[in-house]
Amino acid sequence: MELTGFSRFHLKGDSAADWLASLVTGNLPRVGRIGLVYFASAKGKVLTEMSATRLAEDEFLLITGAGAYWHDRDLLNGYLPDTGDITLTDTTRDYATLLVTGPKSPAIIAAASGLSTAQADFPWLSHQSCQIAGCRVTAIRVSFAGEAGWEIHCDMADVVAVYDAVMAAGAPHQLGHFGMLALDSMRLEKGYRSWKSDLTSDYTMLESGLGRWVKFDKDDFVGRAALQAEHQAGSQRQFVTLTLDDPVDGNADPFGEAVYLSVVQCDGVDAGLVVSSGYGHRVNKSIAMAVIDKDKLASANQITVTVLGRPRAAHLVPTHVVYDPNNEKLRG
């Protein structure tokens, strides 16, 4: 899959790590690793999500969605100090990205790059530099699809040669193409969030179920005071992942899925709204992510989601992960 639309920012400087750490709610990845980082407002609301690839102690590649380009560029530049010891370079138009993912991807990447792709040598959420078709690339072991996979980042001028080499290496493994609708279905199965649907400033980090990325034991960060107060008092709303039963009403469309802002009810009372939904083809289930009233959820005997004007019975997924909850395939 071609993902050149990613927005990319290269961050470097003697105090780059300290500066970035003061903006994000969680910890930064170690050198050689990649991790998700979240930016909150002063009120603790979700502003954006980025992946941070740590190239050196004070050097990072920040990657965010295509649709978030202007928002995230302005967000980063707005916080950038004028001390001159940090540089933030927009490299969005300089690089291309290919995503190779699936159970055969370790063999394909190994054949194309010459790297050992064994988990011990190239672990999940790490990156390495290598060459493919004589072109320098950065291979990052991560996949939004929830399978073993790599993002291959290369110079824009090299992408055709790199693509041809990857396809040639994948030919014995029946490597094919897939698109954004398939990727969106697969990320729902894994409980992965999407900016401006699941990740919006309508909700706080804690309401959005992102508490594991909020570290109160680190130095101060934007939104800490508000999130600390919410943590102590308790959130009023809760992020949930639901699976929906098949329709039992003969008039219901069996192929209908919940849509954005579909109503979620607890025991027949409006309790929240769907923020993402779709059909998971690997698990054969209709999936919806929603934010709902915490008290109503706690006492609910039945949860329903309105689909095409009719209620569909829904069931909580405590882990938020419907497919491969232990991430065994990601490490495969």
Regions found by a protein language model. Name each.
Residues 1-332:
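Basic, glycine/lysine-rich polyanion-binding surfaces/domains
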